[in-house]
């Protein structure tokens, strides 16, 4: 069982607090001197009290930034203040629990995130212990998410760790790969924040592409009537699909993760003004005026099932195109 997980729409007030780099506190007048020695700054004062602020600690700021990213990306359910709590024995309500810094659920994916930071760049001698502990929750977390928030299909469980100023060794990276835990650092986080600011919830599927390379997502399978043709040495398919599904299985371009120039590439390819004009055109005319070219990565993501047709086998062939995100 998962505790402290809510519908995202119920967390608007929390989202405002987490989106800020500072924390705020209202205090009585006699408390002000002590608070000032603890690093609080006086914002405004009245006859009976005052409002103070101070920068968030780095560990708090990292968790809040990661949580805010998932909120901006449109996850349906998110952990509340203090993270989520996973019961290690679902049959015992008062049994031991595992705290998870950030949890996000959407129709395809359930993600459990731990956040690790340091005040200055350094190695963490216990990082592999953290990896092992996080890896142990995978099955319980997946079962709890799918049982408490059921769907016609099971979500894919993703375990990730966001780090800030932690220096990871080759052994750390290898152990994370063995545990199938995604490692992302402060540069990756900044990249996704910029991408989310530019694309909004659509950036979620770029995150999925990076967290789940080659992973089959059961909620993202569909079949379409299609025509198969040849263009030089390449096999091509012509088909129609809903924009919502295309968005989930496609991303705009390959990139080297975490580089600012990749966001610049997105901004050139998908300008907000251009997107607005396209949206207005579709809204007014009900059609998209041109084809979209999609490149499939390998044979595992596409399967063409030929149908009977009259005439010879030369030229175009009619059939069913089976697509899946993987």
Whereabouts are the PLM-identified features?
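Intrinsically disordered, low-complexity Ser/Thr/Pro/Gly-rich regulatory segments
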Residues: 1-216
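Charged, often glycine-rich, active-site loop that binds/positions anionic groups
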Residues: 88-97, 303-317
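N-terminal extension/subdomain marker
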Residues: 146-289, 298-301
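Glycosyltransferase catalytic domains, chiefly GT-A lineage
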Residues: 114-116, 283, 294
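Short acidic/His/Gly/Ser-rich catalytic and metal-binding motifs that mark active-site loops
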Residues: 121-123, 301-304
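Short, well-ordered loop/turn elements at secondary-structure boundaries
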Residues: 98-99, 107, 287-289, 317
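A sequence-level detector for short glycine-anchored, His/Arg-bearing signature motifs
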Residues: 316-326
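Short acidic-glycine loop/turn motifs at beta-strand connectors
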Residues: 106-108, 296-297, 306-308
């Amino acid at each position: 069982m998962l505790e402290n997980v809510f519908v995202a729409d119920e967390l608007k007030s929390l989202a405002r607090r987490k989106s800020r780099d500072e924390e705020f506190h209202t205090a009585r007048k006699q408390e002000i001197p002590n608070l000032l020695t603890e690093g609080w700054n006086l914002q405004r004062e009245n006859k009976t009290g005052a409002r103070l602020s101070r920068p968030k600690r780095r560990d708090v700021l990292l968790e809040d930034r990661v949580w805010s990213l998932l909120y901006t990306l449109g996850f349906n359910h998110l952990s509340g203040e203090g993270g989520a709590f996973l019961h290690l024995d679902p049959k015992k309500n008062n049994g031991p629990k595992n705290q998870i810094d950030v949890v996000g659920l959407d129709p395809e994916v359930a993600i459990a995130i731990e956040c690790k930071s340091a005040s200055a760049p350094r190695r963490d001698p216990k990082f592999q212990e953290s990896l092992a502990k996080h890896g142990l929750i995978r099955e319980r977390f997946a079962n709890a998410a799918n049982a408490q928030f059921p769907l016609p299909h099971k979500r894919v469980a993703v375990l990730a760790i966001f780090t800030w100023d932690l220096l990871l060794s080759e052994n750390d990276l290898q152990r994370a790969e063995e545990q199938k835990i995604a490692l992302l650092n402060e540069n990756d986080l900044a990249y996704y924040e910029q991408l989310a600011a530019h694309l909004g919830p659509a950036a979620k599927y770029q995150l999925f592409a990076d967290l789940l390379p080659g992973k089959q997502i059961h909620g993202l399978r569909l079949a379409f009537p299609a025509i198969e043709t040849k263009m030089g040495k390449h096999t091509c398919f012509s088909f129609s699909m809903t924009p919502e599904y295309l968005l989930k299985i496609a991303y705009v371009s390959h990139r080297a993760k975490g580089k600012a120039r990749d966001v610049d590439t997105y901004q050139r390819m998908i300008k907000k003004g251009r997107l607005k004009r396209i949206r207005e055109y579709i809204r007014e005319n009900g059609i998209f005026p041109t084809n979209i070219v999609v490149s499939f990565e390998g044979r595992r993501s596409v399967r063409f099932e030929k149908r009977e047709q009259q005439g010879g086998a030369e030229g175009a062939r009619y059939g069913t195109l089976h697509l899946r995100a993987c």
